[in-house]
Amino acid sequence: AISDTDYKLKKGDKLFIPYPVKTTDTFDAGAIKNAKKAETRKPDALRVGIMLPLHDVDGDGRRMVEYYRGFLMACDSLRAKGISTDVYAWNVPADADIRISLLDDNAKRCDMIFGPLYTRQLKPLADFCRANDIKLIVPFSISGNEVEANPHIYQVYQSAETLNERAINAFMERFPDCHPVFIDCNDTTSNKGMFTFGLRKRLDAKGISYSITNLKSSEAYFAKAFSTSKRNVVILNTGRSPQLNVALAKLDGLTATNPGMRISMFGYTEWLMYTKVYLNYFYKYNAYIPTTFYYNALSDQTEAFENSYRKWFRTDMQTALPRFALTGYDHARFFIEGEYARGKSFRGTKGQSAYRPLQTPLKFVYASPDGGMRNSAFMLVHYMSSRRIESISY
């Protein structure tokens, strides 16, 4: 359902928004575009609401349309499992008053609602879901602490501070007997100081020695930072590709003159964007990348999904990381399957879901004793020297 706000679509804009959609055995782009109002809900059908900017006016809208398409593909796959869904969608752009959408009688009938995208729309939607006993899944970055006080909220987004702490914990657990080597990349735009300073502080507290060197150091001084007896774990203080490229060249020179030296790298989520360029280097230097998602283009399941997306919507997914259609698919499968199996008792905690995500794992913990649930899924993507990739979940 597209809300009656001041927002107006421009001539030529294309939307694929059902109002509402009842999943069917056959599913294509035309079914979305021309969907008619759903029939009376079956007793076992879950009512799902989407309140996001679903338009073709700007990047936010295009990304959310892609998320929504993946969501609908999940509903179609669930149909084959005997799980019926009635999906209702409201276009809620940045300047919309979400309270207008909430006047629609279909909103209060939902079992769960996914949204909003914008922080200022969160409180009225959260209050509405609390009043009507509806699960509210907030799928993207939102400011504020509504989740601390509202037990109906499921916050998927994790703050930079939280992820930084988890990356440090993972490093300390994975490399207790290694020699960390911090490389200053002379990048004045870097925002990685929170991680490198935090990690150094933790290493100091544990009495673990480490070295600091610089990309501009001579080969001799650069080599002095590395251990010949322990595995070295290299940490750059930037996530940018140009500096990574220089660092890899320096490591190539180092290992050419010290062939027995053992080296691993601990990177940043941004490195996942560079795999087409640096994949062989990631294998060579045993790279670990902390992340909350992993888009595996080589996976058969991912390839099948992309082919289906291309067939149904006559276009490819955007090249953003994470892929928004895959995110929507994983979110829908996780929550709808969980709600179908466990009803109101489904909280998304460890062990409550058997769903294996294509890209975006979810695992929730209580945000506070009286609050909602906060996503805690985290992993290391490990590029092994055997040219295999493993994901290590925490």
Model-identified regions with their sequence ranges:
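Extracytosolic ligand-binding ectodomains
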Residues: 1-394
